[in-house]
Design a protein with these regions (language model features):
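Conserved small-residue
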Residues: 8, 26, 100, 145, ...
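Active-site-proximal gating segment of KS-fold condensing enzymes and close homologs
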Residues: 104-156, 302-313
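Active-site-proximal alpha-helical scaffold in enzymes
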Residues: 138-142, 146-149, 154-187, 223-243, ...
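Conserved active-site "lid/cap" helical segment
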Residues: 15, 20-102, 108-109, 274-286
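Active-site-adjacent elements of ketosynthase-type condensing enzymes
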Residues: 43-46, 111, 191-213, 254-273, ...
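Glycine-/small-residue-rich "gating" segment that lines the acyl/pantetheine channel
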Residues: 123-129, 170, 191-241, 259-261, ...
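Condensing-enzyme catalytic core mediating Claisen C-C bond formation in acyl metabolism
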Residues: 3-7, 27-38, 42-46, 210-282, ...
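Active-site pocket-shaping loop/turn-to-helix segments
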Residues: 11, 60-81, 129-137, 155-167, ...
Length: 407
């Protein structure tokens, strides 16, 4: 594939708002999980909640979109000067030539939960001020971002469970390569809600401790929330126009193995297909990857399947899951971890797997227990969702991409 430029990016999660606080937490191996105190949930588990979401209503002209999920999206869009960079892209290309691709799993379902608590006791009708289309509808986050920037290009919501925030890069790439747009705002946003917490509890997948990916004592996930975005554009025709360390999207792999509604293929066949496709599309070999950001949810079956998918290809490649720090942010996870990959490339370090203290010897992985500075030229980021919806992304720096082109 032709590389795409990540001209700007940002991330907001329980470990920090924006890149600086996120980077500090990753370098210091500092997690943001706390005992669950969300809404009226009575669950013995840990969550990754973003501070300040409920204190910032959505912009007045977008009041119809008012809900926690869109508040979180807005909080993410206003970090790191991201909104200004998008505005500059709109001025350069035109509002009809900038697309929007947002991944989400549950969107603003919390607003529906609250609406049902306010039903008319006589007839059961939902309150008149409940706006399903602008809140709970899975398209809501994409529509909100499109309206936030007054864009007129194509807008899509991607909802493929936990790979949603990664698959947005593939959708944007296809639109750009087809010549339909010149740039895209891609990202993922999912906020906490009772449906998610109790749903994963019913599957017996919630851990009673902060989750411990790839650890011998791992026993389940911790749910988090996040908003992460990137501005994706074509690489300029003149190489001199790029900074030597600019971040590029080099490869994308997607697969759908449909093994089971909530369990991965035990041998990780669909995941491996996505990884191999990403390597092929980037014209790279496994030996070119310097760090793997694992999907790493900390359930026994998920981590084992991902380990088998990586197999001998990456047995000696440093890897870690940042979900021990952020929790599993579901539809936002792929986008959030893409930004982690970009930070690893920009800052030349690999982040530690927070909460993991004793890597499972049964899993073939060179698991990073302490963040360290090292040469990082290309990063593989994995996102594997329920139902076998898999996506792997490869990011690199321009210097490495130039070397790849010369081979």
């Amino acid at each position: 594939m032709n590389p795409l430029l990540l001209s700007h990016f940002t991330a907001t999660s329980c470990i920090g708002r924006g890149l600086d606080t996120t980077l500090d937490a990753l370098r210091d191996a500092r997690g943001g999980l706390v005992p669950c105190n969300f809404e009226r949930a009575d669950l013995d588990t840990w969550i990754g909640a973003v501070d300040g979401v409920d204190e910032q209503p959505v912009r007045a002209d977008l009041a119809d979109f008012e809900c926690r999920n869109n508040r979180l999206a807005q909080l993410g869009l206003t970090q790191d000067g991201f909104d200004a960079r998008v505005a500059a892209a709109v001025a350069r290309y035109g509002a009809a030539r900038v697309g929007v691709f947002v991944g989400t799993s549950t969107a603003g379902i919390l607003e529906t939960e609250r609406a049902y608590q306010r039903r008319d006791p006589a007839g059961g009708a939902l309150p008149a001020d409940f706006r399903y289309a602008h809140t709970h509808n899975p398209y809501s986050p994409a529509a909100f971002v499109r309206a936030y920037f007054a864009l007129r290009g194509p807008a899509m919501a991607i909802s493929s469970a936990c790979s949603s925030g990664a698959k947005v890069f593939g959708s944007a790439r296809r639109m750009i390569e087809a010549g339909l747009i010149d740039a895209a705002v891609v990202g993922g946003v999912d906020s906490l809600c009772l449906t998610t917490l109790y749903g994963f509890n019913s599957l017996e997948l919630l851990s009673r401790q902060p989750c411990r990916p790839f650890d011998v004592a791992r026993d389940g996930i911790s749910i988090g929330e996040a908003a992460a975005f990137a501005l994706v554009e074509r690489v300029p025709a003149a190489p001199a126009a790029l900074d030597g360390d600019a971040i590029l999207l080099l490869g994308i792999g997607e697969s759908s193995d449909a093994h089971h509604m909530s369990s991965p293929h035990p041998e990780g066949l669909g995941a491996r297909a996505a990884i191999e496709q990403a390597l092929a599309s980037a014209s790279l070999g496994a030996h070119d990857i310097d760090y793997v950001n694992l999907h790493g949810t900390a359930t026994p079956s998920n981590d084992a399947a991902e380990s088998r998918a990586l197999g001998a290809l990456f047995a000696r490649t440093p890897c870690s899951s940042t979900k021990g720090a952020t929790g599993h942010t579901l539809g936002a996870a792929g986008a959030l971890e893409a930004i982690v990959a970009a930070l690893a490339l920009r800052e030349q370090f690999v982040p530690a797997g927070v909460n993991t203290t004793q890597p499972d010897p049964a899993l073939a992985a060179d698991y990073v227990l302490a963040s360290r500075d090292t040469r990082v030229r290309a990063v593989l980021s994995n996102s594997f969702g329920f139902g076998g919806t898999n996506c792997s992304l490869i990011f690199g720096r321009t210097q490495h991409a130039a070397g790849r082109a010369r081979r």
